Amino acid sequence: MAALQALPLSIDQNAEVSGSQSHTNTRSPVTENTMGSVSSLISGRTYHDKQCKASELSNKCRKPTNMPNCFKQQEGLIKSNYSSQDPLFNGLPTKKPSTTTSGNNGNYVYVNEDFKEEWHEPRVPISPSSDAEDIREERALNGNIRGPPPKLIPVSGKLEKNVEKTLIKPTAFKPVVPKKRNSSLQYLVQRNGGPGLSESQSSLNLLFNGNAAGIPEKHNLLSCRNSTHSGTMSDSGRTSLSSLPTYSTNCSHQMDPVSVSMGHINLDNHTNINGYSDRAPRGRTRPTNSDSGRSSSSKSTGSLSGRGNPSSDSGSCDRSPILSDEILIRELEEKLKDREMELQQLKENLDENEAAICQVYEEKQKRCEQEMEELRQSCALKMKQAAQKAQRLQQVLQLQIFQLQQEKKKLQEDFSQLLQERELLEKRCASFEREQTEFGPRLEETKWEVCQKSGEISLLKQQLKDSQAELAQKSNEILLLRAQVREARSDLQISEEQVQELQDTAHTKTLELEVCENELQRKKNEAELLREKASKLDQEVAGLREAAVANLRHGLCLCHEKEDPFLLYESDEAKAQRQNADNLQGLQQYVERLREALTSERRRYQEQADSFEDERRIWQEEKEKVIRYQKQLQHNYIQMYQQNRELERDIKQLSLELEARELDEFDLHGAEIQFEEITATEI
């Protein structure tokens, strides 16, 4: 629950100022967040003192202040706590300054809020339990349609028991630290920036803003009222107005009803005190519903913040009291008695809710502080982001300015160049005009010459047409010849390719023949070597045969000594035959061994020759591939070169033909134009 806080009525007591002086709207400072008992709410001053104060107020320069509504009291507390240290509150919207007017039919000052509003606008006091942000949202959604104040949301643990049945009363409360019941009295009117009302006194503005039924205003019921009422109010509710003096002071001033936040009793007969009156009120009050929900307090308490009709600051001096003031005093005595009873009942209700309200207030204050800290951080972050964004935008703008300056310089240079070109063109135009004036007579002569040659031109035109037809025919023939030449070139190219291929094959064949001749020569050399080896082997065989024969003979000699007697009787021929057979067998074996070695050598040689032949064949194939690829590339290059040459010749020829046609058309067109002009001049 937010703290209830009111703004006091600060009236400067300067030197004597005339009643017609204009009043300025100022905003009073926020009062201290102090608490007091309910007994401090009742003023202990006499009515005579108040009459003296009222007489002094009219002669001073009054600076009325705004009396804030209940929903502004939370902002007042927050601003008083944070305005000195947080610059973010400078941007919060302030309430409109109040206007102070004095009525034609009264002697009291009415300090009202929003005096510029419509007189029929309803005023709904707002519960102190509602938050300022909730109030703003409700105003934004509902506009001027205002309903009863919202119920208090239970925050502390004490308020969660009977939420549906019982509602917290929007009454003043005192702090946890107890104080005396009879605290020092504080007056409503603060002089020269004195200390403001306590929060307990200012919070009673809600108590007296109960259900008040608006009664139509009766104007000019009383012509004048005196401000010389005196009386006393005590805590026990004893009120007696019988001892009030009825004499008037030297000068009585007309004042509007003052709407004070503590619900101070207004002595004007136009003020609605109990919510109903048989006399004319100063303005319509706003019907409200009390947050406590009690019918006894809501019906008995009235709104003292009503607005009075605007009137001029006019007063009359030395007026005598009238009978209506006495009747009003009696009615006020009865009303004050009822009010004292209500105050006693409110005192009883006050003590019941103080502890819970204090706890709720502390919790809400902590939440408000947290929200303000978050708001400060978010605002600082937004300011930082905005500064960074502004810096980036400044850099971008500087870059754009630099680019625009460069473009401006370029445009200035281009403009200067264009001016120079313009001057040159003007000079040329002037020279052309001079030449035109000079060539005028010559042009007339040339016209007559053109008339003479127009006939020749017509003949030349006919000849030109014939020549163009012949040229078209010749061009067709040329195209046919070109096609034939292209075909012949393609045939020639094909034949050249075939000849080249045949030359390549012949060259390869010659290379193969050379290789074969080399191989044959090598084979011959190898055969000679083999013959030499064979002759050497024959010689060796002959030597071996001789050695074998000698060995056989030596062996035979040795054998004869050991022969049996039977062999001795053999003939010499048989011995010779046997020796020859043995020698032949040995020679045959040796020859077989030599033949085997020769075949192995021949086989090895053949294998080497085959491997050499394979390598030679592979190398030859690769060589032929490379040669064929090179020939193909060379042929392609030659073909492309020839095609490019042909295309260049064709392009040149076509360009010449086009130029010739353009020249012919230009000549024909120019001749026709001149002829028409000449004909027109002759006509």
UniProtKB/Swiss-Prot annotation:
Ligase as UniProt keyword: no
HAMAP family on file: LZTS2
Coiled-coil intervals, chain numbering: 324-665
Cellular component GO terms held in the UniProt record: centrosome; cytoplasm; microtubule; midbody
InterPro entries named among the record's database cross-references: LZTS, LZTS2
Low complexity bias locations: 290-308
Cysteine disulfide partners in this protein: none
Name of this protein: Leucine zipper putative tumor suppressor 2 homolog
Pfam families in the record: Fez1
Main location: cytoplasm
Region Disordered: start-end pairs: 1-37, 82-107, 262-320
Role this protein plays: Negative regulator of katanin-mediated microtubule severing and release from the centrosome. Required for central spindle formation and the completion of cytokinesis. Negative regulator of the Wnt signaling pathway. Represses beta-catenin-mediated transcriptional activation by promoting the nuclear exclusion of beta-catenin.
Cellular compartments annotated: Cytoplasm; Cytoplasm, Cytoskeleton, Microtubule organizing center, Centrosome
Keywords, sorted A to Z: Cell cycle, Cell division, Coiled coil, Cytoplasm, Cytoskeleton, Microtubule, Mitosis, Wnt signaling pathway
Family as reported in the entry's similarity comment: Belongs to the LZTS2 family.
Entry superkingdom: Eukaryota
GO biological process: microtubule severing; mitotic cytokinesis; negative regulation of Wnt signaling pathway; nuclear export; spindle midzone assembly; Wnt signaling pathway
Composition bias, Polar residues: 11-37, 96-107
